[in-house]
A protein has these predicted regions:
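Bacterial Sec-dependent N-terminal signal peptides
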Residues: 1-23
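Residue-level detector of functionally pivotal "anchor" positions at catalytic/ligand-binding pockets or at interdomain
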Residues: 428-450
């Protein structure tokens, strides 16, 4: 894969330390759960997630929640309004649950050691009862604001769509700084009022509800520099933007536009490594050369300037419901994801269906000390994928593919494995089983690091299916 503008872009920042600016955790050991999917309100609403908080905390340090503001269309708790057309920012009653249930969920997750990421939709906003009559934003001590048609981009369809009726031509804000979003009003982020409103909103979410960080929706819709401004004002633990583009250069340019003050979802990795790579048995697509030298896992994570600024994922609520969905072997995909740098984000349906594989993979990542900035080298093979990740506690060798060797490499021991994938951890890696014995979803059977069934004998020893005693 060629990156035409990458060299020019990197030369401009070559003298900067990787973490010179921004609210981005360095050498992060975080693993994130996307705690919802499209129309999962009855399964992953606030009340349901709170009941799962203990299990979530066994695997994850971050949970990304869906949009929690009252949205266009309204509806009851458990209804099918996902929330991506927010109507009233200071009303946190949604189809996902009530404001009180949201506060309770976040408190419970915090008590279990899990930080919470809000899905922030500020590119666009729905009118209260019509095209452009926004509700007032009363954030109490954080400030009160009211946006009008003067705060809507002049390029919004409200000025061109005849069905806007009396609102047609009334949007008098500056031209959009990004792509237009049809169906809701594009906010003019050059406006000082819009900026003040957004900053108050974020600080209110943080102060009143306990959110720790932000996932910015539809970042193609407004300039990246505004994300930097909003992060400076709200100081999130972690910020990640949905810059939905498979181009390395496009995502890198957006990160730079924020002032390197936000991470970005690694869509280049999603498409190269998963959709066009592993799903098609094209192992060569799963790695890129860093500066025409060392082979690394494909995506933003292939380069040292961006791997610590990437949130990697296999699927999300959007890609999972159309032809962007990953169609290959899911445990194999997470073997790649959890052996790679960046902050990995696990999709809720994948976690619940394949937890007996994903949990041991997460545990192996933690036991070897793999971080968002870890050095990972890919060795080239025509019929399988192989990488070695160097963590703070040991090394993790990952093999994916039916043709991959099954022997245990010298200096390593088997960490965990499944159909067509295996993790080997270096001998110096701390041993023992941690967060790896759990209830399988469909029954109460226990499994070990390698997915083998285990049980206890009369003396309390855990016995694997091959008869070996493992622990007491």
């Amino acid at each position: 894969m060629k990156h035409i503008t990458k060299k020019l872009l990197l030369s401009a920042i070559a003298l900067l330390p990787a973490w010179a600016v921004g609210q981005v955790p360095a050498n992060s050991t975080d693993v994130m759960l996307q705690g919802f999917y499209w129309n999962s309100q009855k399964l992953t609403g606030w009340a349901q997630l709170e009941q799962m908080a203990g299990d979530i905390a066994k695997d994850f340090t971050l949970v990304w929640l869906p949009p929690s503001a009252s949205a266009e269309g309204g509806g009851p708790v458990g209804g099918n309004n996902v929330g991506y057309h927010p109507r009233q920012w200071n009303n946190q009653n949604s189809n996902w649950g009530t404001a009180d249930q949201l506060k309770s969920l976040i408190t419970t997750l915090h008590n279990d050691g899990v930080r919470v990421i809000a899905d922030v939709v500020i590119n666009h906003r729905a009118g209260d009862t019509d095209w452009g009559n926004f509700t007032a934003d009363d954030f109490g001590s954080y400030g009160s604001y009211r946006l009008t048609a003067a705060n809507i981009c002049s390029t919004d369809e409200m000025n061109t769509d005849p069905s806007a009726g009396k609102w047609n031509g009334m949007a008098t804000g500056a031209p959009d700084t990004g792509e237009n979003w049809g169906g809701a009003r594009d906010l003019d982020h050059t406006s000082s009022l819009v900026q003040a409103d957004c900053e108050a909103y974020l600080n209110w979410l943080k102060g009143e509800y306990g959110y720790d960080g932000w996932r910015y929706d539809f970042c193609k819709g407004f300039g990246g520099k505004y994300v930097g401004i909003y992060n400076d004002a709200s100081s999130p633990y972690l910020s990640v933007g949905e810059m939905w583009d498979g181009s390395y250069d496009v995502v890198a340019e957006w990160i730079e536009a924020t002032g390197r003050k936000s991470m970005a979802f690694d869509f280049p990795s999603k498409y190269a490594a998963f959709n066009n790579g592993l799903a098609k048995g094209n192992y060569g697509s799963m790695s890129w050369q860093e500066d025409n030298s060392t082979w690394r896992p494909a995506g933003m994570i292939h380069h040292h300037n961006y791997r610590g600024l990437a949130v990697t994922f296999v699927d999300n609520h959007d890609t999972y419901r159309d032809d962007n969905k990953y169609t290959g072997d899911v445990p194999q995909a997470y073997a790649f994801l959890l052996a790679s740098p960046g902050v990995p984000c696990v999709f809720y349906p994948h976690w619940t269906q394949y937890r007996r594989f994903i949990s041991p993979q997460i545990d192996a990542r933690r036991r070897t000390g793999i971080t968002s900035e870890s050095d990972v080298v890919v060795t080239q093979h025509s019929g399988y994928y192989e990488s070695i990740s160097t963590g703070t506690k040991g090394k993790l060798l990952c093999r994916i593919g039916a043709a991959a060797p099954k022997d245990v490499p010298t200096g390593y021991r088997l960490g965990c494995s499944g159909d067509g994938w295996a993790y080997y951890v270096s001998e110096e890696t701390p041993s023992g089983i941690s967060q790896t014995l759990y209830d399988k979803n469909e029954d109460s059977t226990l499994y070990d690091l390698s997915g083998r069934e285990v049980k206890k004998d009369a003396k309390g020893f855990v016995i694997s299916s091959d008869g070996r005693k493992m622990l007491k």
